[in-house]
């Protein structure tokens, strides 16, 4: 490979990295700046002259951030469990079980991915109201408890497994649950980690649906609570930046713990042509 192609490739990678990581680093820098530092100076100053954690203390004084974070954690953890269980069972059924309408069911899941959430959000709200789940964390969880994308991801992971292994287990007398739990499921742990990460991120970052379904401040999730850091007539960008960093840190920790499974799982669940 010519040298100029290598240089161009790494230059593009660095440019993409700057676009992806730059805004977060800027928010982190802003959150560490004191009230006497001008965050809108020209040229901009990236490194704070006197780093301080006072902005994080102010976030906790302004809103009950830890209560909101705990509500988000409950919803996100439940979303991980329901997606891992539901998507795994549905994905295995679509990939391995033989029944009439299996292809049609797969098409339904694909079509479900194409429907924008905003287009069905009124129907979701009406359904939650009829079930008496408005203003509850269960009402926040239920619409996204099993994602069509995660189902298809698990389906493709199971399709990539050699079917001969399960056939041999079937000949030895293993039933479908034994083949699923002892052969198929251990082989797709990487994809399961990907599903867990996507489910946690989706629930943790969700703003629109909790904003619509929740009205009691004691049940607010973190994304809604952080919205109250914006003033009506004036904003303290340092305070908002500190709240943003608090919201992002759990996602960074989760990905750091599961990254080796994530990259392996992306390959397991890749869409086959």
Residue positions per predicted region:
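A structural signal for multi-pass alpha-helical bundles of membrane permease subunits
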Residues: 5-273
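Short, Lys/Arg-rich, polar N-terminal cytosolic tail immediately upstream
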Residues: 1-3
């Amino acid at each position: 490979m010519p040298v100029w192609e290598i240089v161009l490739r790494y230059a593009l990678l660095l440019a993409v990295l700057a676009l992806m990581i730059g805004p977060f680093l800027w928010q982190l820098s802003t959150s560490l700046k004191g009230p006497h530092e001008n965050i809108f100076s020209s040229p901009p100053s990236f490194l704070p002259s006197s780093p301080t954690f006072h902005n994080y203390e102010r976030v906790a004084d302004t809103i009950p951030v830890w209560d909101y974070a705990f509500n988000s954690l409950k919803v996100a953890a439940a979303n991980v469990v329901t997606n891992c269980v539901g998507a795994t069972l549905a994905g295995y059924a679509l990939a391995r079980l033989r029944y009439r309408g299996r292809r049609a069911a797969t098409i339904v899941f694909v079509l479900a991915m194409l429907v924008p959430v905003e287009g069905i959000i009124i129907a979701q709200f009406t359904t939650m109201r009829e079930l008496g789940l408005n203003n509850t964390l269960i009402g926040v969880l239920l619409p996204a408890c099993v994602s069509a994308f995660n189902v298809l991801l698990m389906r493709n992971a199971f399709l990539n497994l050699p079917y001969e292994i399960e056939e041999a287990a079937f000949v030895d007398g293993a039933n479908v649950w034994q083949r699923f739990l002892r052969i198929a499921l251990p082989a797709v742990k990487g994809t399961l980690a990907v599903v867990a990460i996507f489910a946690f991120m989706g629930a943790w970052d969700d703003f629109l649906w909790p904003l619509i379904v929740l009205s009691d401040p004691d049940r607010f999730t973190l994304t809604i609570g952080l919205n109250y850091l914006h003033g009506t007539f004036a904003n303290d960008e340092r305070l908002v930046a500190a709240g943003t960093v608090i919201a992002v840190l759990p996602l960074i920790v989760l990905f750091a713990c599961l990254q080796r499974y994530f990259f392996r799982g992306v390959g397991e669940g890749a869409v086959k042509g």
